[in-house]
């Protein structure tokens, strides 16, 4: 029997020690491990990014006065892979489980791990049918960004440190984009 576990590198729980530390103050060393932004001039979310489950992808943290990003539920804040400390920490999580004997990972929402550095609004979707609000915008600044393949390559390098292990990513993209995620191994 082989054991494959779900790895969720895009976000953590809001109860995870990393996020609790990040949330504790703007000066905390782990603050940059998550995506925090000041409010827009009107006090609202920093941009128009939407949650997959409805509404804005941002929640205001009253204590710090900044918003944190969550493309799913508010209890799943997004890690900031532009922070140089985050990827090595996640690679250590992978090694922890591989050392325990798991045979590989199904990597959740792997194509969402990087976000636009400038936090630009996603443009309106001209083909939106008015049904699913999440589809009202084209997610050009929130998914499948340049650089995500390098993150995946570094994750694959960890897998290659072990014999007979595997990794597969959950990716919902058009076929022409999806093919760019197929590796040689």
Say what each PLM segment does.
Residues 1-95, 99, 111-174:
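Acidic/aromatic-lined carbohydrate-recognition and catalytic surfaces
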Residues 105-107:
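Hydrophobic residues within beta-strands of alpha/beta enzymes
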Residues 171-185:
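Noncatalytic carbohydrate-binding groove/subsite architecture in carbohydrate-active enzymes
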């Amino acid at each position: 029997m082989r054991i494959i576990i779900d790895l969720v590198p895009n976000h953590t729980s809001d109860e995870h020690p990393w996020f609790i530390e990040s949330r504790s103050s703007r000066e905390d060393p782990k603050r940059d491990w998550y995506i925090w932004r000041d409010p827009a001039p009107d006090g609202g979310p920093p941009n128009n990014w939407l949650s997959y489950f409805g509404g804005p992808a941002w929640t205001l943290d009253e204590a710090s006065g900044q918003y944190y990003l969550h493309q799913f539920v508010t209890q799943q804040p997004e890690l900031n892979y532009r922070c140089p400390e985050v990827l090595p920490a996640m690679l250590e999580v992978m090694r922890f489980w591989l050392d325990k004997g798991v045979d590989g990972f199904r990597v959740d929402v792997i194509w969402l791990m990087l976000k636009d550095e400038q936090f630009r609004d996603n443009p309106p979707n001209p083909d939106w049918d008015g049904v699913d609000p999440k589809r009202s915008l084209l997610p050009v600044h929130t998914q499948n960004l340049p650089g995500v393949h390098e993150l995946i390559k570094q994750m694959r390098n960890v897998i290659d440190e072990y014999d007979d292990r595997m990794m597969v990513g959950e990716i919902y993209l058009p076929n022409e984009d999806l093919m760019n995620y197929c590796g040689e191994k």
